[in-house]
Amino acid sequence: MFSTFSSQSQPGGPSAPIVKMNPLFGLSAIGSHRLFWSFGIVVLVAITAIRGYAAPVLRFPGPTSSQPLALTADGTTLLVANPDNNSVSIFDVKDDHNVLIDKVNVGKEPNGVAVLPGGGTGYSANTVAGTVSVIKLNGSASSVKKTIAVGVEPYALVLTPNGKKLYCANARGSSISVIDTTTNTVVKTINNVGPEPRGLAISNDGDDDDLDETLYVTQFLAVLDASKIDGADNAKRGRVALISTATDAVSGEVFLNPLADTGFKASGDAIARIPAGTALLYKTGAYPNQLNAIAIKGKFAFVPSTGASPNGPLRFDVNTQSLLSAINLATKLDANKTINMHKAVASQPNPTKLFITQPWTMAFRNKKAEGYVVSAASNIVVKVTVNLTTGLATVKRDPVDPSRVLEIRTGKNPRGIVVNASDTRAYVMNYISRDFSVIDLTSSPERVLETVKSENLPAPGSQLAQIHIGKELYNTSIGEFDPPVAGQPAIVGRMSRDGWGSCAACHTPWGLSDNVVWIFGAGPRRTISQHADFDQTDPTRKIQRVLNYSANRDEEEDFELNIRNVSGGKGLIVLADGVTPDTDVNNFRPKANAKRKQLRVRGVNAWDAIRAFEASGIRAPLSPISSSEPQVVAGQALFRAANCQSCHGGPQWTRSRLRFMPPPDVSLTPNGEILSELRTVGTFDPSAFNEVQDRLDGPPFGADGYQPASLLSLHAFPGPYLHNGPADSLDMVLNNVAHRSAGTSGVDTLTNPSDRAAIVRFLQSIDARTAPIP
């Protein structure tokens, strides 16, 4: 018997034959030529048909990196993670079909996906579930065929070049799970990679051996340089761990140095005690922070990051920067070719500047020394070229208008990018708009061909829609607001000046902390995570703590002043015309800032939406430490005995509360602080070198004490601790006798180091699953 298949038009040419599976033997019949079958023996009649045969691609064309979307090696199938919907969408992208094949429900909050080079199987890292889903790709009947338990908060996935091993970064477990893709089982856990691993990349030497490669792992938050002053522009360094795929063990580490000169000047230097003047004379630096991704090209690995430039005085263009660092893979050292991508935008004409805020990830072409960096807050992708000899990257200009940087506009809050093997298409995952952009890489300049929906947005008018709009505003440097009169152009650009800055630039996209000590007007202040601003056990979210270390704000809407004075934006609180910024915005008085006339987004008040996100959309990180661990149990008992809960008790793990309806009576806020919420526990040291106010025109707050910090998910925010970072560890925090005896009227019950160690272990175990201490 024989089987005949008719020829169809394919990318290889009008007469290129299709390869189809014979259902009886599982073998391929080729094109319009015939295969004769006799007792399972195949005789090829027309050998010329071989020229059209497309064998499965079983190896990736170049190095691989972790992303929230993934392509098969032949570029025909795309997987897109939908973190807010607990699903993965599967698309046919061959020949620009860009059609949804299926949508598969996976574990809670999938953030990373991967797919075997030859297709057939995909994977998703489900952050809250603590699992990796194994997805059988079977057209419209795709499904989860296995669920693998991994570490705490799995975030990123990356496959070896031939797909034999899958590595999973467990962000809160500070570990890497190694998965054998043949058996889909965890074969090893690598535990000493450093806190909060996020970005993964694997080299590719082009052979069949996956055991001769190197895995590169970024540590999300920068590491303090012990020789520097926290709050200085060179206080910290980025860190990348190296892992051998042969041994699955850490083989080294690379530190990414601060950039000495960002190219933007300040009017003074608070750390050096040079008061602010009127001229911009003083050089500023920045260190790599928020290292979410890493990508390999040639002999270098490139790491985009939000650079922290914390020294005062404040100005919109000397706080966060847009860094791209290079690692020399041969020397395993920083190549010292870090650039500030913002600099490329600085010379552009106003008012059309758009800075490259929050460079979140990147991908390279396979056949050219060209890459694409995703600016999550500015909703753009920018192009870079790299010198393959030195590692120096250059931001490319628009060939149509060389006075401008090439900006490829995407959907809202892009967070991932992949390039196909033929370098013809790039695909960008847009987190907030829940879609992906298809970029034509063959055109000059590159352009978006299509935007394809991956998941549904919340129903308009619902609480989820309000939270989602708040998340959108929290994560944007621009903002797109309803016009005051229907039919008029949208109002844009109110969140920052020229797209420089966003809430997420300091609080991360998850509403947490960048762990930076900033030199602010109140003094040195380590960024406070917002996951404990509201009592998450209260369904009404009416219970709120006071805000900032010095309790000098009572409403989330007071941070309108940060939009204006830190990010340089015009803000969201407006006059009756619905457009003009209202200049009467202050902390405390004379007006409450909540429920004032605001810009609106799709009919929702902007600040109401941001507040809804901060109250209900920010999740407390999960702890990797079990509450049943004996040392944790002992530590909790000691915590109670020392009456630590007198300051750090309750559902928010802080006694700080907003106990009045704003605006407060003047008697409640002498010196601009809510004094009733402050505690003096020996943590203010006016002689500390970084205990300065940003403009040096007054003393820093602190003599009256600070509001008690929340202990909820404390493990997620590594040292240094306290408002100005003087304690490298929690043990150092507890070495302060005044602090540890504050709940026992000065009687020190924690003189034993082992007791303090037990309390530290308990503190590191606290998360939203821990029963609060009343």
What are these regions (language model features)?
Residues G12-P14, W37, L71:
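Alpha-helical and His/Cys-centered functional microenvironments
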Residues M1-S32:
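N-terminal secretory signal peptides that target proteins for export/translocation
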Residues S6-S9, S28-A29, G40-V43, K94, ...:
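Prokaryotic Sec-type signal peptides and long signal-anchor helices
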